[in-house]
A protein has these predicted regions:
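Catalytic cores of Mg2+-dependent Asp-rich isoprenoid enzymes
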Residues: 1-157, 162, 166-273
Length: 273
């Protein structure tokens, strides 16, 4: 299996939202985006799948060295091999990849967030920076597109958090800010137990509205001159916003299930965006 094939298998499963967003990209940019997302999956899987925090820290430290090698050395991992020509072709920054690892490391140090600014920092590191990297690969002529890309990444992460409340709770994690829970009178223990209530639905209504506001904020920053180049992000936004609407339509049943869109609907959204 070549490094590119490994990345394809890791990051872009047929039917995933990401799969539909890159369908229309030229091959060179598609390979680059897939390599970046495969890297994100590798480091995210360490946090999600390695139960011993000290082992996870060691693995993340190894990836820090692999990133450095991808920018000027002899990397060992197939994802780092795939990244090596990408970072040169698109003049990407090593610091951005290290920041993504910083974000993943936050999951090893904390399982709660006091307020939204704390959560925004986490989202910036694990997703906003991914948006910035993606913008460089997709291309832009107006620097304000970077603001769009960063905020869109945060919107994507907020959507993931909403979709995965129950799944994260079963891992002992609550990403919804503690002051949001306090505002709606919900104890952390109720989330961990998977208890639905009117207060929980009110909380989730608030969280979905905030995520939608981040999409609005991102899209307002995208200049017309860069809309075509940034189409992959717009496709992802259309799919993820539809997912938020579906979650709300289902009554915010995110504690015991994972809402998703059908492949046909994703394809239709991608085609019309």
């Amino acid at each position: 299996m070549t490094p590119d094939e490994y990345c394809q298998q890791k990051a872009a499963r047929s039917g995933s939202s990401f799969y539909y967003s890159f369908l229309f990209l030229p091959p060179r940019k598609r390979r680059a985006i897939i390599a970046v997302y495969a890297f994100c999956r590798e480091v995210d899987d360490i946090v999600d799948e390695v139960s011993d925090a000290s082992v996870a820290r060691t693995k993340l430290a190894w990836w820090r060295r692999e990133v450095a090698q991808a920018f000027g050395g002899a990397p060992q991992h197939p994802v780092a091999h795939a990244l090596q020509p990408v970072v040169a072709q698109f003049v990407l920054r090593e610091a951005d990849f290290q920041t993504i690892i910083d974000g993943m490391a936050m999951d090893l140090e904390q399982s709660r967030f006091l307020d939204f600014p704390a959560l925004e920092l986490y989202c910036h590191r694990v997703a906003g920076v991914v948006g910035l990297i993606s913008a460089e690969i997709l291309g832009y002529v107006d620097p304000s597109t970077r603001g769009y890309a960063r905020d869109l990444g945060i919107a994507f992460q907020l959507t993931n958090i909403i979709r995965d409340v129950g799944e994260d709770a079963r891992r002992g994690r609550i990403y919804l800010p503690q002051d949001d829970l306090d505002r709606f009178g919900i104890a952390s223990s109720a989330i961990l137990r998977g208890e639905y209530s009117d207060a929980f639905r009110a909380l989730m209504t608030f969280e979905v509205e905030r995520a939608q506001q981040w999409y609005d904020r991102a899209l307002a920053q995208l200049p017309d001159a860069d809309r075509r180049a940034q189409r992959a992000g717009l496709i992802m936004a259309a799919i993820y916003r539809a997912l938020l609407s579906e979650i709300a339509r289902d009554g915010f049943l995110v504690l015991d299930r994972r809402t998703s869109l059908t492949p046909l609907r994703k394809l239709w959204l991608a085609w019309k965006t």
